[in-house]
Amino acid sequence: MEHVLSTHLFVNHRLNTVWLDKILQAGVPAVEIFCARQHLDYRDRAQINELGHWFRASELKLHSLHGPMYSDDVWGRSGPNSHLSITEPVKSKRLLVVDEIKRALDIADVIPFKFLIQHLGVSQEEYDDRKLESAFGALEEISLFARERGVEVLLENIPNQLSSAERLVSFLNQTHLKLNFCLDVGHANMREGVSTAYTIMKGRIRSTHIHDNNGKDDSHLWPLYSEGGTIDWPEAMKLLRTGAGQYPLLLELREYPEFPLPQALATVKTLFEKLETI
């Protein structure tokens, strides 16, 4: 399977060419960039242009971009208006969210990538038909804007009442949106289970997020290394291999003291090898 690393691993550090060089030197051929403004400020043309110049001269490929979740650089702590959700029921506010996501998509004009990973709502959000109507309108506009730039929008299963595997499939069936999925294995472990989520989503999976947790907390633990993870990785990999070639093995990990940066990148390479051989 193709190996991809999400820059979520060092999302609290500003993304620069030094980090990208280290990823390439670790033997990872492609990345997903996590769009958080303290990490990648999609409004900062200087940062985007610097990275674009580096990518044009590098073998490292930009596989995907994780859509922004907040408009600030402090994980939404500046206030509720900084939270970006396409389920926002107030049209004027939702249009601002769509505009912010479009700003991130503009990166494709400088650094081409295949996929934008998009959340449907926020963590722990309750189900409401009106929220899905809001999301439908937003996704129509975002998808059109993305396609004009050669990008496909993928919906990710996240731990809320709108984005279980079953709800995502139902949403696409009802709206007839021609979208596919990013299967987040860690999030599935917190909801219906990895096997169930995979079975429901498998025909539309185009990318993955691989990480572990205790079934309750979205802690982005390191598979096979971190203590407290509850995913059966031999079984999970057996499932994922049935669709090999349809999607990559994409690690979305968190920085932990036991895996200090940048040395942790060497462990990333070993982790890919372990997952492929279990």
Regions found by a protein language model. Give the residues of each.
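Histidine-acidic metal/acid-base catalytic patches
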Residues: 1-4, 13-27, 162-278
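N-terminal pre-domain/capping segments
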Residues: 1-103, 109, 147, 269, ...
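Alpha-helix-loop-beta-strand connector modules within alpha/beta enzyme cores
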Residues: 51-67, 136-148, 174-176, 232-236
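Conserved beta-strand positions in the central sheet of alpha/beta enzyme cores
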Residues: 32, 64, 117, 154, ...
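Flexible, glycine- and charge-enriched loops at secondary-structure boundaries
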Residues: 41-44, 48, 87-94, 125-132, ...
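Active-site-proximal loop/turn and secondary-structure-junction residues that shape catalytic pockets
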Residues: 9-11, 35-37, 67-71, 120-124, ...
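A short helix->loop->beta-strand "cap" motif at the edges of active sites that frequently abuts
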Residues: 58-60, 113-114, 151, 243-248
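Active-site acidic/histidine proton-transfer and metal-coordination neighborhood
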Residues: 17, 74-180
